[in-house]
């Protein structure tokens, strides 16, 4: 039985670092294990222009722990006033690696997102021309659509028309939560990929609602039925190159989670690799872990894989704090509900 595994240092292709005191508190949890991350731009105000992305990158670099080797991959927040020329320049400079589509109101800090997709057609056409990926939060915001159906409806109503109207547009369907989303990615050809989170491989909607409300399992897209969770695990561990890790690790202070109207997001940066090693071992797929966390993502983003290696070693249960302290308040770690036996060694 495998007791250790050495792989290329992983990347996180969907990460929330926040800003200010929260950024300073959570950044070390990512840099401890990950070499690069696609950093989400949904700050207040959002990161819309190349200049704003450069300034945010500087703040991230200034907050790095001493000796950390980490490259933030910057993303622009797509709005109806985004300038195609600015997107082109930001991509040409090497600063920006993607543009993020948030349907207005779909998730945390998405009020500036897109309502009229005709108004972003010029940006999308520019992105298709230069090969810059569009990262998509794949949920409709129509209040008539049940929250558990919003991903499947988005594919039909929004994403498919966008892709038909913009040939060559490279798209990442982020944090896929349904079999519908998985099948859409699989059928999308070489310009289509999907990220899978750690927590959606572990929890279904019962974990959030059955026996009491558990706010630290509440995220968007919300976890779905068990049949979808099992399909996600199969996709993550099955060796398909179109799927890769995007944790969507989303820190909120506990006071914002444990309230009458709590924020959406699971904070998984600290223990993601140990959880994933457990999942891949359960599925008899430890040999495919490296592809999921370190190879498939760079291949889609047309970046070289990391040369540095890390080792995961199986041992006694990992002892982690229930929460980390930040200047913005304590942040509770995602609890997978089972002992973590895989330790990460640099």
From Swiss-Prot:
UniProt binding sites for substrate: 16-18, 42, 137, 220, 252, 264
Binding annotation for Zn(2+) 2: 100, 137, 175
Record pathway: Pyrimidine metabolism; UMP biosynthesis via de novo pathway; (S)-dihydroorotate from bicarbonate: step 3/3
Known catalytic reactions: (S)-dihydroorotate + H2O = N-carbamoyl-L-aspartate + H(+)
Active site: 248
Entry's cofactor comment: Binds 2 Zn(2+) ions per subunit.
CC per GO annotation: cytosol
Function: Catalyzes the reversible cyclization of carbamoyl aspartate to dihydroorotate.
Protein name: Dihydroorotase
Organism of provenance: Cereibacter sphaeroides (strain ATCC 17025 / ATH 2.4.3)
